[in-house]
Amino acid sequence: MAATPRDADIKSFVIQASKDEGRGVDVKEGMSSFAFYENIMSNHITALVKVTDTGNSIERDGKKVSILEGLPIRGGEEIRFNIEDSNKNKLQGELYLNKIMDNAQTTKQDSFTIQCVSKESFTNEMQRVTKRYEGKISENVTKILQEIMKADFKPENIEETSNTYNFIGNDRKPFYICTWLGTKSIPTENYGKTGGFFFYQTQDGMNFKSVDNLLGQDIKKKYVSNDSDALPQEYDDKILNYDMNRSVDLGSNLTLGAYNNRTIYFDPYQFKYTAKTFNITEQEGVKHTGGSNEDFDFINPIFTETPTRLMSAILDLGTLPTGADAKAQL
């Protein structure tokens, strides 16, 4: 999420030249805005910085020139920042310049927006998961982050899974694999009645956490959006602006089987099949919705009575069995 807009003390915001460690420029005096984004739907953190440059920021060939020309900025430059807001909340670390946007030039100044991301965002593009993995999913996510990504994370932010899953990386990117594993992960509680895991990054590092445990946490802070300048006593802060994205399409949801569906699994080893039915009405009181379970949102019950989507799958029994050799696998 973006940091709440407020007065802040920008102690430093230094852009380092890619090929010269000792060459850099602090653009804090030209910054007009800084937005730092953490998003549970994103694998990496992002920041947007608006800068106005009068053209006398850095010396090159004996004369003062603009930042874009003087460093020069070509992408991938390391950015070291140290910011403290009016509540003494500190935000500091390193990001890397991804791109320059909204570049407007006049005879007197340049204005542009810098988009910067974490180093892990670029590492993900340069690495691939190739090995075969077996065992608990959470342990394999940890291995990928440590051995392939060399990413920063706290062990407690990789939530333990109760299930195991054997797989091969197939030369896919680490972020893709970890996000994909999240859809197959089950926390240690409520086996079979959960919504999977999120894989995301915060300023504390990478996170792999279950949807249910995230939504089941105690309330940390309360925010409100209103037309008054006053803050109601029961709230911690105000929402300055927001966008709501919600649509209702009953027909499409019925086609997708969002409320009631049935899957038939065929067992080629025993030559038999089993059928499993999902009904949204069975999730009340089990899944966390982010609010009170008493407000579990149902559509008209007549549309949840029978499966609206039928699916089939073949069980891959005997595929990728646990063990390093044939003897262990048998």
Predicted regions and their residues:
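Short beta-strands and strand-coil junctions in structured, solvent-facing domains, enriched
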Residues: 57, 103-104, 122-123, 187-188, ...
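Second-shell loop/turn segments in exported
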Residues: 125-135, 163-169
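Assembly/oligomerization scaffold segments
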Residues: 1-126
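Short intrinsically disordered coil segments
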Residues: 31, 63-72, 129-135, 222-230
